[in-house]
Amino acid sequence: MKILRITAQGLPLFKKDLDICFYTQQRVCEEDKDSLYRLTDNYYLHSACAFIGINASGKTSVLKVISLALNIVKNEPINHVEAKSILGGTKKATIRTYFYDKRSYVCCLETVIAAKKSKTGEYVYSILSESLWEKPIATVKSKKYLTDFTGMKPVEQRNSDEAYLSDDVSFVIAHNKKANDTVEIFSLLSYTNVNVLPFTEDIPLEVIAFLDPTIEKLCFEQTEGKTFIHLKFKDEEEIILNNAADLEQYLSSGTIKGIITFSMVKEVLHSGGYLLVDEIENHFNKEIVTTLMRFFMDSRLNKNGGTLIFTTHYPELLDEYDRN
């Protein structure tokens, strides 16, 4: 499954409707094709999408909308999704997610969501209505009409028969099972200011050396239900830790965040999923950030169409993109 476009209306933090497009809308030059992912024929997707702006300009909010839309089409319960906070106390928010599925169909999922305050004062979200449109991509005459469903009737609508379905889970779950399709999401939204390395069995030595050349060994070991971390610097004795949080005493925040990020990059490039990173430059120098971007913008490495979506304060990162 590949996301083509996301639109949102009725969100408290946005005065205007939000419209985010992930496919190229203009003609693609031959030299640009290597940095894009070819969907089919002349349709290409952007593999590295950046939202650039000053503080409090809404970058993180946009990332939360994308995360919410992705989780809806992945059949995650809205009330369990971290990015649900973007809905606030909305009376009626409409999110349309346009995607391309394994059957070579372009689909549009419209999800209408409302908030209700619980006894504890927290907002609880439920889906008021849902509709799904679809059309074979072969019937689309040009890019202009790729996500245009004007005049078409939905192929499915949410109804009361779906009593077995939780009221915060999208009915697109049936479509996904039928098409044997899903979307893989890796999010670093919660790692913006928290850097605790989660358990991982495979940290490539090349990645560790790139982030900190003084590290000779870093690996996790699980024995009898306990986790041990082996850390060794060059020309020094090995250190054994039993708590990942203790790594902060020995490794910089940039190294920890780098290991987390590059481990996820490996998964995303393999699965063709989505990696969301807020404030990508946090603890990273420009060289590391541009290396990350180039992983996704190299069609030889990114054969499955993995997508990096990130926010940043640094406009100089735009130099990595070809602009009109």
Regions from the PLM with identified roles:
Residues M1, K15, R103-C107, K119-Y125:
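Coil-to-beta-strand transition motifs
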Residues M1-L4, V207-P213, H230-E238:
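N-terminal accessory segments
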Residues M1-L70, E238-N324:
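Switch/communication elements of ASCE P-loop NTPase nucleotide-binding domains
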Residues A8, T97-R103, S131-E134, F233-E237:
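Short acidic, glycine-rich loop/turn motifs
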Residues P12, G88-K91, T223-G225:
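A short catalytic or substrate-binding loop motif that flags glycine-/basic-rich loops and adjacent residues
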Residues Y44, A48-A50, I54, K64-A115:
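Conserved P-loop NTP-binding catalytic core
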Residues I66, L70-V73, T200, P204-I215, ...:
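Hydrophobic, Leu/Ile/Phe/Ala-enriched alpha-helical segments that form helix-helix packing faces
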Residues V112-E224:
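Electropositive, glycine-dotted interaction segments
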